Structure formats: structure tokens, C-alpha cells
């Protein structure tokens, strides 16, 4: 399982660089613009320059509306700025067909510029609160649009977490659907160390965190702490080892 960490500034990216051995992907977002809020192109470039060259940089293009042209241009801006994972939050898509239309436009825009870039279609575990596509529709949207990964996050950051809205058995079905279509499965949404057991067991490919590695557990007011990144990775590795030998980890 890969660990994706989301700094919101160059300063935080430098903190991530200090913990580079413990993380796999540096994700650029702007939390005050939403769950998958897009940051500025120059911030993506500066963060790309700040972290080790062997660490991929991902970038969100926003909690996007159903406007395929607008979203495709935003996605191209992210990949031109140096991101190799492009994440799209299907916030304004109310049907699978709308999601597919948006994601096909993104895939074309991104892959025409950089064929090896990875495109991630993200739905929301709390979709029922905002009226967007059902979480279990996202793997099919990703597959039919030519994307590389399907993701779930939470749209409303009010202290509720991924498993509060989509229980582990439903997340496991999400992962299974993604894998059946040859996609990576990414899960996020106020994930904590306590969630790592079920996330590991269900075969999650990428886990995304911010609050769990911020001072005080606060994704907005807190700053990413290298020692918390290291601790989170250590717990991930412990669960991976114990899962590999069939021994349930004790939290």
C-alpha cells in the first residue's frame, strides 16, 4: 500500500521532503477550497522542485462541476505544472454518464501531453450529502473513461470519516470493483492509524492522509510533522507484515 501525503504549501512540502523515505506520493491540494481543492500552478511547480525527484507528485484539479471542457483545461494545467498523478473530484456529476464525460475529457487532455501520467477519478464517501454519483459507480466511471485509478474521499470535512459513510465491507467492494477493471484503488477521508487494519486487509493500493500527520490532527490549522509521517508509515508497515503472515494486527 502506497502512502500519499497532502501538503498545502511549499513549506509543508519541505517537511514532507524531510520524511521522504516514509512516503510514496506527495499530493498538492488547497484544503480551504474543498476536499479536493485545487492549488495554484506555481505551487505545484514549486512543490515538484522541493521534493526528491523520485517521489511522484499528484495534484487535485478541484471538486469539479459538470463542465468537461473546464475540467480538461484544469487537468492539463496540473500535468504541465509537473504533476504525474491527476486527481478529479466528481463533485458536480450527478449521474455516471456525466462522470464518464468529464473523465474522458480529462484523460484525453492529460495523456495527449504526458502519456505516462496517471488519471484518478475520485468520488465521495458522503455523496448522499452533496448529491453526486454513488461511490460504487466510480470504478466503472474510471474504467469506461480510460482513467488509471478510482478513489474515494469525503467531501465535507466536519470530523466524520470514510468509514462513517461507507463501511469497510462497502469499501472492500469498491476496491474489488476497481481491481476487476484493472484499476488502482485509492481511499482517503480523515483516515487514521486505526483504519489501517481494514484498509490493508481489503487490498487498498493507495491511502491518502493529511490530518493524521498534521500537528494536533488538524488538517486546516495544523502543519504536517515529519515524525507523524514516520509513525504513520511504521503502522502501515506493521499491518502489512502481519497481514502477509495471516496474523491480525492488534491496535
UniProtKB/Swiss-Prot annotation:
Keywords: Lyase, Schiff base
A molecular function GO annotation: lyase activity
EC numbers for this chain: 4.2.3.153
Signal peptide range: none
InterPro entries in alphabetical order: 4HFCP_synth, RibuloseP-bd_barrel
Residue positions of the active site: 29 (schiff-base intermediate with substrate), 87 (proton acceptor)
UniProt function note: Catalyzes the formation of 4-(hydroxymethyl)-2-furancarboxaldehyde phosphate (4-HFC-P) from two molecules of glyceraldehyde-3-P (GA-3-P).
Annotated Pfam families: 4HFCP_synth (PF04476)
Catalyzed reactions per annotation: 2 D-glyceraldehyde 3-phosphate = 4-(hydroxymethyl)-2-furancarboxaldehyde phosphate + phosphate + 2 H2O
Family designation: Belongs to the MfnB family.
UniProt name for this protein: Putative (5-formylfuran-3-yl)methyl phosphate synthase
Amino acid at each position: 500500500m502506497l502512502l500519499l501525503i497532502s501538503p498545502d504549501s511549499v513549506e509543508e512540502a519541505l517537511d514532507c521532503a524531510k520524511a521522504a523515505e516514509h512516503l510514496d506520493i506527495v499530493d498538492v491540494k488547497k484544503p480551504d477550497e474543498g476536499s479536493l481543492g485545487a492549488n495554484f500552478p506555481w505551487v505545484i511547480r514549486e512543490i515538484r522542485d522541493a521534493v526528491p525527484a523520485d517521489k511522484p507528485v499528484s495534484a487535485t484539479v478541484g471538486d469539479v462541476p459538470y463542465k468537461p471542457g473546464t475540467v480538461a483545461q484544469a487537468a492539463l494545467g496540473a500535468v504541465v505544472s509537473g504533476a504525474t498523478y491527476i486527481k478529479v473530484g466528481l463533485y458536480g456529476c450527478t449521474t455516471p454518464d456525466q462522470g464518464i464525460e468529464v473523465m474522458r475529457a480529462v484523460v484525453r487532455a492529460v495523456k495527449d501531453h504526458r502519456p505516462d501520467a496517471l488519471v484518478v477519478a475520485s468520488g465521495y464517501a458522503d455523496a448522499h450529502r452533496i448529491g453526486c454519483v454513488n461511490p460504487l459507480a466510480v470504478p466503472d466511471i474510471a474504467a469506461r473513461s480510460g482513467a488509471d485509478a478510482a478513489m474515494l474521499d469525503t467531501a465535507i470535512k466536519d470530523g466524520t470519516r470514510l468509514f462513517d459513510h461507507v463501511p469497510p465491507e462497502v469499501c472492500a467492494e469498491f476496491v474489488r470493483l476497481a481491481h476487476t477493471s484493472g484499476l488502482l484503488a485509492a481511499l482517503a477521508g480523515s483516515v487514521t492509524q486505526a483504519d489501517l487494519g481494514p484498509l490493508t486487509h481489503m487490498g487498498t493500493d493507495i491511502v491518502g492522509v493529511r490530518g493524521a500527520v498534521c500537528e494536533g490532527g488538524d488538517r486546516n490549522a495544523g502543519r504536517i510533522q515529519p515524525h507523524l509521517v514516520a509513525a504513520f508509515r511504521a503502522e502501515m508497515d506493521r499491518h502489512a507484515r502481519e497481514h502477509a503472515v495471516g496474523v491480525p494486527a492488534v491496535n
